[in-house]
Amino acid sequence: MKVYTDIFTRDEFLSDSYPM
């Protein structure tokens, strides 16, 4: 589940740059 967590974390981090 490391990959899933990594993607989720990246999504939150990127969300700060471009809020969906």
Swiss-Prot record:
Any Pfam family matching the protein: TCTP
InterPro entries to which the protein is assigned, alphabetical: Mss4-like_sf (IPR011057), Mss4/transl-control_tumour (IPR011323), TCTP (IPR034737), Translational_control_tumour_p (IPR018105)
Signal peptide start-end: none
Gene3D superfamilies, per the entry: Metal Binding Protein, Guanine Nucleotide Exchange Factor, Chain A (2.170.150.10)
TCTP domain location: 1-20
Stored SUPFAM superfamilies: Mss4-like (SSF51316)
UniProt miscellaneous comment: On the 2D-gel the determined pI of this unknown protein is: 5.1, its MW is: 20.9 kDa.
Homology family: Belongs to the TCTP family.
Record protein name field: Unknown protein NF040 from 2D-PAGE
